[in-house]
Regions:
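Short beta-strand/loop motifs in extracellular/secreted proteins, especially
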Residues: 269, 338, 404, 440, ...
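Extracellular beta-helix/beta-solenoid repeat scaffolds
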Residues: 1-162, 169, 187-203, 208-232, ...
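Eukaryotic tandem repeat interaction scaffolds
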Residues: 425-484
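Short, compositionally biased serine/threonine- and acidic-rich segments at solvent-exposed termini, linkers
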Residues: 543-843
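N-terminal targeting or signal-anchor segments and their processing/structural boundaries
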Residues: 111-114, 127-139, 144-150, 154-158, ...
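C-terminal outer-membrane/trafficking sorting elements
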Residues: 8, 844-850, 854-926
Length: 926
């Protein structure tokens, strides 16, 4: 037994073998400046005989020195068992790290770790008190516990005695742990964090396993087997984890398996997580890009990184809510372009959390703050298998996440041929696309339910430009359920099998036309439907979203709810054809399938003011949202308005409006808060050069340690000095470049806030969207938390009826969830019994047309106040196509000869000098 007190300097090679080293608590330990070895069952621990219950400092290693542990050595009761220094070499094998605050701290520069195997980092408490060592841990950081007014930002850690904090704690270090047989892998257990790393590059290849990782007194909501945070604007850092597959469980009984955070906008974080097995987690893998403009690259097109692939996750710990509760979750609040594949994973989800929901695999965004625009795919969820049980809420989901694909998720579960399998319980949805998840594809998925699903096997809510193609929806519950504004939804060639209701439109559903009388959407109804094959409830506005079906190939709904359904569902012509958009399954990768935007009938009705009857509930808010959606579509696809006078007049009419101003904010966010390709290329080149130079210097240091002659020592010393000088110049240049980008980004945020302050909202939709934009820019875009008043504002907006509150309602809810972990309840929309069901009629118009109907000879009476030198009458057909334009100038009565037009429903609108009259409908009947 050896007793040690104070700081002992190891200034010559020294070994403890089969020793029991008792270290005086407090500021005592070892400063190693020459080689130091612990082996043969040596135990270094706090002196239990001392008259206090405090930690000792630990072993600090300095300079080009080697620290070796082996053969069942043990380090216990230290603040930092080992603190590695710049250019150290650590060889750590068969060592127990027990009851330490941190096992190995590596924050002082790169060091060698040539051997790291068969170690056990055990945090079982209670730990001793920190006592006089408190000043030595003031720079240790972790994600803040959320709730209240915090937002899981990185903050300093308060010491707790309940369990060890972290096995490895690293910063700006490139960790590379190579493969080991399962029996000799490193084990991290009973800690708040197994491995915690900030910046740098992390590669872990079948090297370590994690068990019983929970926060304990460090708060339930901040913990992970592995936490990696990329927050310094120094270039693209990387995280790669290759697990054991089915050879061993990588994460066992961990509240979170891995949380990977990208928090800087200079360059996306590269990520690849594959072949892990997780048994007993609440959230398996969490890709977190909420703060500071962070983004992820995780596909084979970027340096071989595969995203999240071939993992097996059993998520069954229904603990208090985390920021996200899912087998695999990708949360992206930034306007830049991420590219992540989540593929070939198997997730078994068996817990429910109520309000915020639990999901097998989820992509969560913050529209419109995180919308990079069309033409890109940010997350591609494909070829996965998810089983839901015990009321788990959602299988696969996109929430406020644009530009996402859910495709080819099928086969391999408890019942063959299921991508999502609802085994038991009362789930919400098999596949869910909600809350402004725009520009998405859901194709070639198979959902099977053995117990009823509440919202739908496919549930689509307030999401535009979605394509839902060739999905199989089998089992009780609504097969496909559309609600609220789902403008330009394409629901084609899906199979609804043995559902409660096969196809449901309710809650003011608007999708745009589902086919025409000559080209149908080819969906099929198979089996029996206990309520109805298809339902459009009394809330929907007719004339906007008719569904056309064929009487072949089981494409006719077996039953349609009376009255409203008969005004929504129509038989097509006898020779009608079906168009699936996608020829066959499986759906190809995103680069091979991206249908172009086009002008639809709904676009024309919106542009003409025919989309929402003026007496309909929430008419003002709904019309504003339709206008905003169309403005966005035309802004993102300017060629659509070319040669189209209706669209050109629509753009002219809204020029200078708040819609244009608010969309302008979105455009500036996309352009000014993200890094450009040329900048990324320079950052990557500099980073590659820096990493190579650092490796060269470490190699020279190794040679220096072996050098014997004065000549060799002098030569190597000079080479190292020269390389250090060049490296410092390169690092300074990199930091300067990234610093300039951050300064530009900060200035852009200030400019956007000024731009928003200049907007004077007229209706609540504009008030909400402007305020949520402001809070977004002041918090997550600036890498800051929200205060209590901002959170209260977000909650108030999020709980409004989305029809009246507009796009800001979805964005407020998503932002509140990202800041607190709590998704506010969506507000209810009143007056269900009074919801409008009329098609546009002359009783609502300031124009008068008579007689109506007739064979085509009409008289139009125009109020005097609406006529002028440039007054136009426009005739549109039932599909919204422009049939005829007539200049009426200052005439108050106009005769129309439309006898050459075929039978059908038509619309009449008037465009005057800065005034658009409310349109009316009429019928030609020969």
């Amino acid at each position: 037994t050896v007793y040690s007190s104070g700081i002992v300097t190891v200034d010559k090679a020294f070994t403890f073998s089969s020793a029991n080293v008792r270290v005086q608590p407090g500021l005592s330990g070892f400063d190693v400046i020459k080689n130091f070895t612990l082996n043969q069952n040596t135990v270094v621990s706090g002196n239990a005989e001392a008259d206090c219950n405090c930690l000792w400092r630990g072993i600090y290693v300095y300079g080009a020195t080697t620290m070796t542990t082996d053969t069942d050595a043990s380090i216990q009761d230290a603040l930092y068992a080992i603190r590695a220094g710049f250019k150290n070499t650590l060889s750590i094998k068969k060592t127990l790290f027990s009851r330490n605050f941190i096992g190995i701290r590596g924050t002082d520069g790169n060091f060698f770790l040539p051997a790291f195997e068969e170690n056990h980092f055990d945090g079982v408490g209670p730990l001793k008190g920190i006592c006089s060592l408190e000043p030595l841990k003031t720079d240790i950081e972790a994600p803040e516990a959320y709730g209240g007014q915090s937002s899981q930002l990185i903050t300093f850690v308060a010491y707790q005695t309940g369990r060890g904090f972290a096995g490895l704690y690293l910063a700006n270090y490139s960790l590379n742990l190579s493969a080991l047989p399962p029996a000799t892998q490193n084990e991290f257990s009973d800690l708040a964090y197994g491995i915690m790393a900030y910046d740098g590059n992390i590669t872990i290849d079948r090297n370590s396993i994690f068990s019983n990782i929970a926060a304990g007194a460090y708060f339930n909501r901040r913990t992970a087997g592995v936490l990696f945070v990329d927050r310094q604007p120094q270039g693209p850092n990387t995280f790669s984890f290759l697990g054991n597959g089915q050879a061993a469980i990588d994460f066992d009984n961990c509240v979170q398996g891995m949380q990977i955070r990208s928090e800087q906008a200079a360059a996306p974080t590269r990520v690849g997580i594959t072949h892990t097995t997780m048994d007993g987690v609440q959230t398996g893998i969490f890709l977190d890009a909420r703060f500071g403009g962070g983004e992820f690259f995780g596909t084979g097109t970027h340096g071989g990184f595969t995203g999240v692939k071939d993992n097996i996750i059993d998520a069954n710990l229904g603990a208090p809510q985390l920021i996200t509760n899912a087998g695999i979750s990708f949360m992206d609040y930034s306007p830049g372009f991420s590219e992540v594949e989540i593929s070939d994973n198997e997730v078994n989800l068996s817990y429910a959390l109520g309000g915020s929901g639990s999901a097998g695999i989820a992509g969560i965004g913050l529209v419109p703050g995180s919308d990079p625009g069309p033409g890109v795919v940010e997350v591609d969820i494909h070829d996965n298998r998810v089983t839901l049980s015990n009321d788990a809420e959602v299988g696969l989901g996109l929430g406020s996440h644009p530009n996402g694909w859910i495709r080819n998720n099928s086969g391999g579960n408890a019942t063959a041929g299921n991508g999502v399998f609802v085994l038991s319980g009362n789930s919400w949805a098999g596949i869910q696309v909600i809350a402004e998840s725009n520009n998405n594809l859901v194709a070639c998925n198979q959902v099977t339910a053995l117990s009823a699903v509440t919202e739908g096997l496919l549930h689509v809510n307030r999401s535009q430009n979605g394509q839902f193609l060739r999905n199989v929806l089998d089992g009780p519950g609504n097969g496909a359920h559309f609600e609220f504004d789902c403008d330009y939804a394409e629901y084609r060639c899906n199979e609804m099998i043995d559902n409660t209701i096969g196809l449901l439109y309710d809650n003011f559903a608007v999708t745009g036309p589902q086919g025409t009388d000559s080209i149908t959407n080819g969906n099929r109804w198979l089996g029996t439907f206990s309520v109805d094959g298809a339902v459009a409830d009394i809330s929907v506005i007719l004339g906007l979203s008719e569904y056309y079906y064929r009487s072949v190939n089981n494409e006719t709904p077996p039953s349609v709810v009376p009255t409203i359904g008969s005004m929504w569902f129509f038989p097509a012509l006898a020779n009608a054809t079906a168009d699936c958009l996608l020829d066959e399954c499986p759906a190809p990768d995103p680069l091979a399938f991206a249908p172009a935007a086009r002008i639809t009938r709904l676009d024309t009705l919106v542009a003409e003011g025919l989309a929402v009857p003026s007496e309909a509930p929430y008419a003002e808010g709904r019309e504003w949202q339709h206008w905003y959606n169309l403005w966005r579509k035309l802004s993102e696809n300017p060629s659509l308005a070319s040669g189209n006078t209706v669209m050109q007049d629509f753009l002219t009419g809204l020029s200078g409006s708040n819609i244009e101003a608010l969309w302008g904010v979105q455009s500036v966010i996309r352009d000014s808060l993200v890094s450009k390709a040329s900048f990324l290329a320079n950052v990557q080149f500099n980073l590659d050069t820096i990493m190579q130079m650092e490796a060269n210097i470490l190699d020279l240091d190794s040679l220096l340690g072996l050098a014997m002659s004065p000549t060799q020592i002098a030569l190597l010393t000079q080479q190292i000095s020269d390389q250090d000088s060049i490296l410092n110049v390169r690092i300074t240049a990199q930091e300067t470049m990234c610093g300039q980008f951050e300064s530009q980004r900060t200035a852009a945020i200030a400019g956007l806030l000024t731009q928003l302050a200049s907007i004077s909202p007229i209706i609540v939709c504009e008030t909400n969207l402007r305020r949520v934009y402001e809070i977004y820019l002041l918090t997550v875009a600036s890498d800051l938390g929200a205060d209590s008043s901002q959170l209260a504002e977000l909650e108030t907006i999020a709980m409004q009826c989305p029809l009246g509150g507009g796009l800001g309602v979805s964005m407020a809810g998503a932002l509140h969830q990202g800041l607190t972990g709590i998704l506010p309840n969506q507000g209810t929309c009143d007056d269900i019994e009074e919801r409008g069901t009329q098609k546009p009629s002359k009783s609502r118009s300031s124009l008068t047309l008579y007689p109506n109907p007739n064979q085509g000879s009409f008289v139009v009476s125009i109020p005097k106040e609406l006529t002028g030198k440039h007054t136009l009458l426009r005739i549109l057909d039932a599909q919204g196509g422009l049939v005829k334009t007539i200049a009426v100038n200052e005439a108050h009565t106009v005769s129309l000869d439309l006898t050459s037009l075929p039978n059908g429903l038509y619309f009449l609108s008037l465009l005057g000098d800065g005034t658009i009259a409310e349109p009316l409908s009429f019928i030609i009947q020969h």
